[in-house]
Curated annotation (Swiss-Prot):
Highest rank taxon of the organism: Bacteria
Iron in keyword set: yes
Signal peptide (UniProt feature, chain positions): 1-31
Sites where the protein binds [4Fe-4S] cluster: C46, C49, C53, C81
Cofactor: [4Fe-4S] cluster; Mo-bis(molybdopterin guanine dinucleotide)
Organism: Shigella flexneri serotype 5b (strain 8401)
The protein, known as: Periplasmic nitrate reductase
Length: 828
């Protein structure tokens, strides 16, 4: 084939444009590209939210050049959201980090020095000295790690092993503490096992969708497209949306409900009362499969013990409960009448009744969806428990088309943070550090001395901030997260500890984020398909991908960093003599040898990889590291209701939902005929509980930790927007996404703006008791707050909204309430 230079250039342009848009490449263009190097396509899960969309990644000449929705992926069926289409560009920001950077002055580390390029050996030298000094002088409780629901499964597993087994410190927590911890505790309290019982297949079979504090139109747009299709193609399908402000999901709602912040607890109890008063209980299900318990109340707000609210609490942090009778439960919810609920919530009575009728109608299959509106809540665990009550009263659970479903916001908040157990209190497969039997199981599988894993729960995310500020936590490693921007109360509780000269802060990240720039040492990190990985999404799907390109410069994966750093420590440097005496054969070995190069982990040869398959980590070692770690980890859940398939199956299949038993995935847990752990004749079995029964909790309304008053007269709610993901550290480096939403704005009701002499586009100072930021007034647009509330996204590093937020948490889950604090506005 002969082409002129002009035709050649034109064909190249056509090929590039088609690839970027996920379109088929025209024949002439395909032929021209083929003369250079054909685009190679391989599957991967999307890098962003917890939906778990499948994408096809196109690589050419060592770079990711295109991305399209995977038509064979059952989650998204070939469709991407706007962020998914621009995945290639998140990897190639102009300020991508390519070498370690240490604060230095006069050739040495200095807390006040300038960031200076160093080698990896030099970086590990400094880290080794800081870790060993802290461990020797103050012990394991003086070191900590803050990880991520964006870690791959084996990265989270490796991190947990290093800290809990190697360093003997449970001071490791993921950023999922800020988003999913309330869901975890809610699941564990009600069902005894974590994660949803249903799946996305419910969407096409449901009669009604109820969104509790979830703007799925922007935060889970692919799932929302499926709900939209269901609603618009079936006039009998109903959508109800509850929120403290109006957002894009309201555009589809048949019943759009705006309620006073914190009063969702009242609505939930009202619906339970309605179900009982209208004889809508599924008596057969209820009598066989449910227990009733009354929970402790007045449990505080997770603030420092010296805070007046904590001093005033009668049962601070109490998770206690006691059995109660049905008559007592009936009397408890009877207080939440229609009249009282309307008064406390500000919701019209007819809307409340319409909502309650959805749950009470035995012929309607209902799905309840929620995300941060429930979870980022000082009574987030209670909110989770109370929505489960509605499904347990009516038996609308664990069957196609109906059930409660907690959506996740990160790609592996489920698969890594929760299932692997990277929380400060957890171990793999729902085990916990406080349980001696669970610790014993881990120690035996890891072949480490009995008593190695501490029984004491480590510091959770907010407690880590406080310990850094107080000088109790002195070496702190943050990976795959931007908590300096994303965490609460930056001014009072985070920045002081990070910049305290007693402390040494390490941040591993691909970009110079707010967190990285506040650190002492920055480690350049490989991202997404620059490494082999695995994520677990919101519906228990585990998804694998292969390394498809190499990371730029000296950037290394989080797994590489963890494993290489472990070589710097011998067992006698981190374990006391009494432990070594139990396993003297481990004396003199490095943590690398004990944790990551065991016969169990290293038994899979690198020859299992295709000759042309990239896998920098495994080829460096000579064994298939990811496979070894995964198979060791997977053995914790097999036979215990958390069964994962063999490693190789995930590379062959698009996705598999656990438990995977005899090669078959599970769509609906806990019900006969769907779940292999429920025997014939049992009907339902909530086997996370010893008696196989789920729990309905009686839990009351309790007020927020901070509410508007005469001086700080507005509620502030924070969150996200469609175009940006979390702190924007990836999406703001995509020019198209940045242009679409270049800076954060303050969404405000027009009358609230007018009362303060503010107009759309004006600069405004937003002030709380903890800090202030300058933003831009927005009285129109996608988010429409009611009078008395303002909404501000947190993606903008130039407008750190978390200078304003309060570090109050749910006392049970330790998850921060980012949705409710009090602010005032000042015109600039």
């Amino acid at each position: 084939m002969k082409l002129s230079r002009r035709s050649f250039m034109k064909a190249n342009a056509v090929a590039a444009a088609a690839a970027a848009a996920g379109l088929s490449v025209p024949g002439v263009a395909r032929a021209v590209v083929g003369q250079q190097e054909a685009i190679k396509w391989d599957k991967a899960p999307c890098r962003f939210c917890g939906t778990g969309c499948g994408v096809l990644v196109g690589t050419q000449q060592g770079r990711v050049v295109a991305c399209q929705g995977d038509p064979d992926a059952p989650v998204n069926r070939g469709l991407n959201c706007i962020k998914g289409y621009f995945l290639p560009k998140i990897m190639y920001g102009k300020d991508r980090l390519t070498q370690p950077l240490l604060r230095m002055k006069n050739g040495k580390y200095d807390k006040e020095g300038e960031f200076t390029p160093i080698t990896w050996d030099q970086a590990f030298d400094v880290m080794e000295e800081k870790f060993k000094t802290a461990l020797k002088e103050k012990g394991p409780e003086s070191i900590g790690m803050f990880g991520s629901g964006q870690w791959t499964i084996w990265e989270g597993y490796a991190a947990s092993k290093l800290f809990k087994a190697g360093f003997r410190s449970n001071n490791i927590d993921p950023n999922a503490r800020h988003c999913m911890a309330s869901a975890v505790v809610g699941f564990m309290r009600t069902f005894g096992m974590d994660e949803p019982m249903g799946c996305y297949d419910d969407i096409e079979q449901a009669d009604a969708f109820v969104l509790w504090g979830a703007n799925m139109a922007e935060m889970h747009p692919i799932l929302w497209s499926r709900i939209t299709n269901s609603r618009l193609s079936n006039q009998n399908v109903t959508v109800a949306v509850l929120s403290t402000y109006q957002h894009r999901s309201f555009e589809l709602a048949d019943n759009g409900i705006i309620f006073t912040p914190q009063s969702d607890l009242v609505i939930l109890n009202y619906i339970a009362n309605y179900i009982i008063q209208n004889n809508a209980i599924n008596q057969d299900f209820f009598s066989k499969h449910v227990n009733l318990r009354k929970g402790a109340t007045d449990i505080g707000y997770g603030l420092r013990p010296t805070h007046p609210l904590e001093k005033a609490a009668k049962n601070p942090g109490s998770d206690a409960s006691e059995p109660m009778s049905f008559e007592d439960y009936k009397a408890f919810v009877a207080e939440y009448t229609l009249e009282k609920t309307a008064e406390m919530t500000g919701v019209p009575k007819d809307q409340l009744e319409q909502l309650a009728q959805l749950y009470a109608d035995p012929n309607k299959k209902v799905i309840s969806y929620w995300t941060m509106g429930f979870n980022q809540h000082t009574r987030g665990v209670w909110a989770n428990n109370l929505v489960y009550n509605l499904h347990l009263l009516t038996g609308k659970i664990s069957q196609p088309g109906c059930g409660p479903f907690s959506l996740t916001g990160q790609p592996s908040a489920c698969g890594t943070a929760r299932e692997v157990g990277t929380f400060a209190h957890r171990l793999p497969a729902d085990m916990v550090v406080t349980n001696e039997k669970h610790r014993d199981i881990c120690e035996k599988k890891w072949n480490i001395p009995s008593g190695t894993i501490p029984a004491k729960i480590g510091l959770h995310a907010v407690a880590q901030d406080r310990a850094l500020k107080d000088g109790k936590l002195n070496v702190y490693w943050t990976m795959c997260t931007n908590n300096m921007q994303a965490g609460p109360n930056i001014n009072e509780e985070r920045m002081p500890g990070w910049r305290d000269p007693r402390n040494f802060i390490i941040v591993s990240d691909p970009y110079p984020t707010v967190s990285a720039l506040a650190a002492d040492l920055i480690l350049p990190t490989a991202m997404w398909v620059e490494k082999e990985g695995a994520y677990g999404n919101a519906e228990r799907r585990t998804q694998f991908w292969r390394q498809q390109v190499q990371a730029p410069g000296e950037a290394k994966s989080d797994l590489w960093q963890l494993v290489q750093f472990s070589r710097r420590f011998k067992t006698e440097e981190v374990w006391p003599e009494e432990l070594l005496a139990k396993k003297p054969e481990l004396r003199g070995k490095t943590l690398y040898e004990v944790l990551y190069a065991t016969p169990e982990v290293s038994k899979f040869p690198v020859s299992e990889l295709a000759e042309d398959q990239l896998n920098d980590e495994s080829r460096e070692l000579g064994f298939y590291r990811q496979k070894g770690l995964f198979e060791e980890y997977a053995c914790f859940g097999r036979g215990h209701g958390h069964d994962l398939a063999p490693f190789d199956d995930y590379h062959k299949a698009r996705v598999l939902r656990w438990p995977v038993v005899n090669g078959k995935e599970t769509q609906w847990r806990y019900s006969e005929g769907n779940d292999p752990y429920v025997k014939a004749g049992e009907g339902y079995k909530f086997y996370g509980k010893p008696d196989g029964k789920a729990v309905i909790f009686a839990l009351p309304f309790e007020p927020a930790a901070e509410a508007p008053d005469e001086e700080y007269d507005l509620w502030l709610s924070t969150g996200r927007v469609l175009e940006h993901w979390h702190t924007g550290s990836m999406t703001r480096r995509v020019p198209e996404l940045h242009r679409a939403f270049p800076e954060a704005v303050l969404f405000i009701h027009p009358l609230d703006a007018k009362a303060r002499d503010l107009r759309r586009g004006d600069k405004v100072k937003v002030v709380s008791r903890r800090g202030e930021v300058i933003s831009i007034v927005e009285t129109r647009g996608r988010n429409r707050p009611p009078q008395g509330l303002v909404y501000m996204p947190f993606f903008d590093a130039a407008q750190l909204v978390n200078k304003l937020t309060l570090d109050a948490t749910d006392p049970l889950s330790k998850e921060t309430d980012f949705k409710k604090c009090a602010v005032k506005l000042e015109k600039v």
